[in-house]
């Protein structure tokens, strides 16, 4: 018999899972229909579609972890499962990083020659960013598969083992290298891009307030809404990365509140940010409304 707090937690996990599948599914379906109609896809739509697909698989795994934790189902640790998990996790991280870089290049106003060069070519670089991410993540998975005998299972045992074990020095060294290669690099790129974008939008907002003080100008709130959207992206992305670091470096007893809280917060990112993307994109927002209205009419 499940305890009451576990039932509430599982209901929240189900809602989170359904929201993540719906929001990311909307992004994939809408951009897929546009691709069929026009036989081409805009760079941003391509990046969003790839990100949404990776988040769907990530959401599936997070829900699988929730089912394991709640119902004490045995987790089968094999190289294939570990490779799929690592591939989806790292690919989603890099695609989200490139989305932040894309927004920065398109919206931010910086006069540095390198930034101007990036601003003019960012659209053409998107397919290469995606391809480069696939190759890089594949290399990371090959590295993990080489040390899967003592590294990846140790990472997963942090979730589901009750007895703590002392890390070996070689395992710790590899985990440090893995952290730098997998988390630090994309996180640093993302922080630089998004903070630069936030400062640029903040400066633009202050300039608008000074020039049009006391007057009502159409679209005056657009920079503020964009700034709030980017800030929410930053908070979700950063908290997601930090919790992954905690879960991979510390041991938690299953069903403890802190462990359940961390897993729930991890699931908020792929569903919550996709919802923000839909609300901030007129095309996606309109199609999401049409889908909801059609669903109500069919009932």
Curated annotation (Swiss-Prot):
Listed name of the protein: Taste receptor type 2 member 1
Role noted for this protein: Receptor that may play a role in the perception of bitterness and is gustducin-linked. May play a role in sensing the chemical composition of the gastrointestinal content. The activity of this receptor may stimulate alpha gustducin, mediate PLC-beta-2 activation and lead to the gating of TRPM5.
Membrane-spanning residues: 10-30, 56-76, 82-102, 125-145, 179-199, 223-243, 258-278
Side of membrane Cytoplasmic, spans: 31-55, 103-124, 200-222, 279-299
Topology of the protein relative to the lipid bilayer: Multi-pass membrane protein
Ranges in the topological domain labelled Extracellular: 1-9, 77-81, 146-178, 244-257
Family, per entry: Belongs to the G-protein coupled receptor T2R family.
GO biological process entries: detection of chemical stimulus involved in sensory perception of bitter taste
Superkingdom as given in the UniProt entry: Eukaryota
Species this chain originates from: Pan troglodytes (Chimpanzee)
């Amino acid at each position: 018999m499940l305890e009451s707090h576990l039932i509430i937690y599982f209901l929240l996990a189900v809602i989170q899972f359904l929201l993540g599948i719906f929001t990311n599914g909307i992004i994939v379906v809408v951009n897929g229909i546009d691709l069929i109609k026009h036989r081409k896809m805009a760079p941003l739509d391509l990046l969003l579609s790839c990100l949404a697909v990776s988040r769907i698989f990530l959401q599936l795994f997070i829900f699988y972890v929730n089912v394991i934790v709640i119902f004490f189902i045995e987790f089968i640790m094999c190289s294939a499962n570990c490779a799929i998990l690592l591939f989806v996790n790292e690919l989603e991280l890099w695609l989200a990083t490139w989305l932040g870089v894309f927004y920065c290049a398109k919206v931010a106003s910086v006069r540095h020659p390198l930034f101007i060069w990036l601003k003019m070519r960012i659209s053409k670089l998107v397919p290469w960013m995606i391809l480069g991410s696939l190759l890089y993540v594949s290399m990371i998975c090959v590295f993990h598969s080489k040390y899967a005998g003592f590294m990846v299972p140790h990472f997963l045992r942090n979730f589901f083992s009750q007895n703590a074990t002392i890390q070996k020095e070689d395992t710790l060294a590899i985990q440090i290298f893995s952290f730098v290669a997998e988390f630090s690099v994309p996180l640093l790129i993302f922080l630089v891009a998004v903070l630069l974008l936030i400062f640029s939008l903040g400066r633009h907002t202050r300039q608008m307030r000074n020039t049009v003080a006391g007057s009502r100008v159409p679209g005056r709130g657009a920079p503020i809404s964009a700034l709030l959207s980017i800030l929410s992206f930053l908070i979700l992305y950063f908290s997601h990365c930090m919790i992954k670091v905690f879960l991979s470096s510390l041991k938690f007893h299953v069903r403890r509140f802190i462990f359940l809280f961390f897993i729930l917060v991890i699931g908020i990112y792929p569903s919550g940010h996709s919802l923000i993307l839909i609300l901030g994109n007129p095309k996606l927002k309109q199609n999401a409304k049409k889908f909801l209205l059609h669903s109500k009419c069919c009932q």
